[in-house]
Amino acid sequence: LDGTTLNNNSELTQETIDTLHAVKNLGHEVAIVTGRPYRNSKQYYDQLNLGGPIANFNGALCHIPGMPEWDGKYHITLDSEFVLDLVAFNKTLPVDYLMVEGTELVYSDMEELPECPYYPKDQKPIVIGKNTKLQEQPTAVALFSDIEKQPEIKSKILDRYDNDIEIR
């Protein structure tokens, strides 16, 4: 969505809508792929009304809303123990804040998230700590810091987890 389908104001233009519908009318299946969670892309999916699959969380969740029986549906989650260990380890890193997301819930080490179009506006995060009982399997973890601190953070995380994770 971002940087392609949506304009600089995070809106769909009529030209984009018409183009995607023209492609569908030629017999092609149109899929939406985004790094956003579904809750932050649902409005665009509904507005486009194409009926095809949507992949969220950079491909960790793929589904067709309203079709739970779709054979192509999948959801790759993270191990809860790993996530809670990373939450505890995060306290030793030069990170401004951390977010853990599931399909429905948002956890953070902050009570209030900064203003951002990618965060739910109508949902406060659940404050997370080492002993938090996660109410759903997490799909994504994001650590936020100044760009100059990111190489150090990445190195320390990869050292701790034996390069078993991918950092983007």
Residue ranges of each PLM-predicted region?
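Asp-based phosphoryl-transfer active-site loop
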Residues: 1-10, 32
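Conserved strand-to-helix beginnings and helix N-cap segments that scaffold or border functional pockets
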Residues: 9-16, 154
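Short, surface-exposed acidic/glycine-rich loop or hinge patches that mediate macromolecular interfaces
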Residues: 10, 35, 147-148
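Active-site phosphate-binding/coordination module
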Residues: 14-114
